[in-house]
Amino acid sequence: MRKDFFFAAAAVMAFAAMPIQAQNSRIVEEGGSGPYKAIMMEEASLTTHTIFRPQDLSKFDKKNPLPVVVWGNGGCANSPSGHINFLNEVASQGFLIVAIGPSNYQQQEAPRPGQTGDVPRMGGGMPGGMGGGMPMGGGMPGGMGGQRPQGAPQGAPQGGMGGGMPRMGGGMPGGGGMGGGMSMGDPEGLKQALEWAIAQNADKNSPYYGKLDIDNIAAAGMSCGGLQALHMLDDARIKTILVMNSGFFGTDESEDKASLAKMKQKSVIWILGGSTDIAWENGNDDFKRMSGSMPACLVSLDGIGHGGTYMQPNGGDYAKVAGAWLKWWLKGDKEASTMFTGNEPGVGKMAGWSIERKNIK
């Protein structure tokens, strides 16, 4: 039986929902190891999201613009707190990252993009009607699972009692109130991030005026956030997609699966955590369905599982691999491309990593 990768959301969200320090900006890990020391911050013009970017914007202009990455979080969480080391490290390589959710998660009162109910709270409802809240401490939640919201993608969890691992097509486990807001895979938050970046680049009163490379934008995300990124497949403004610990699920006839064969003018990479990653089957099946001439890659770190290396120092190996992919596709960095090209791609030389490719030489 095919596994639903959202089984692992309970384990991931135990830490992913933890609040970031209550402040408008923060230096994470001394700004990262890249050439552009990064900062995590909020912008008054986009309070529903968190920005990760180089601290010194004076180094960027129309001749050296910042590519943009829009990011969706694991569990469709309204906070990037479970990924800050990773996002900060990638930003230090010279990228503007716009992540769904405010940095001050615990005190957030405003609804997130597309939200129709209360914001998720600690021990409260998971967003998107996917069931109850995840408890602190990593214990498996109980209680009533959520209902699939109207218009949710095929295969979205619905109903069912919690208290244990959810079934295929069953509800996310409970433990709190009903979740409100964005349905599973809803890319609205990513679209708002993208449109904000484009508008800021054109606004003469913005600190980002003329400094962003709006022709080179990536959509990326982990687990449920990876589904959000995949649902940007038909957005012509997106150049590449990073699907991390994620993949479409459903039947062979599902619209989501069919969309993979129709993808045009994009590249996509799946970054998985080995056979113990609950998204392993989903991601591999998606990769196999890629057809035509579009570049596609599947890389995996054996044994790391669904949680990845996001909160390891400087984001761990995931930041190295994702950063190289972004530098290749958004900056044209030939050295970075060697991580994925040639007879002996660099990813394959990294301990524990494997790589498969389509239309990449």
Which residue stretches match the model-derived regions?
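The feature captures the conserved acid-bearing segment of alpha/beta-hydrolase catalytic domains
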Residues: 239-312
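Alpha/beta-hydrolase-fold serine-hydrolase catalytic core, especially in secreted/extracellular enzymes
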Residues: 148, 165-166, 172, 294, ...
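Alpha/beta-hydrolase active-site loop
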Residues: 118-128, 162-164, 169-214
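Short amphipathic alpha-helix adjacent to the substrate-entry channel of hydrolases
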Residues: 81-109
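Primarily recognizes the serine-hydrolase "nucleophile elbow" in alpha/beta-hydrolase
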Residues: 192-262
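Sec/Tat signal peptide C-region and signal peptidase I cleavage site
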Residues: 18-22
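N-terminal cap/lid segment of alpha/beta-hydrolase-fold proteins
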Residues: 23-64
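Short beta-strand element of the alpha/beta-hydrolase
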Residues: 63-74
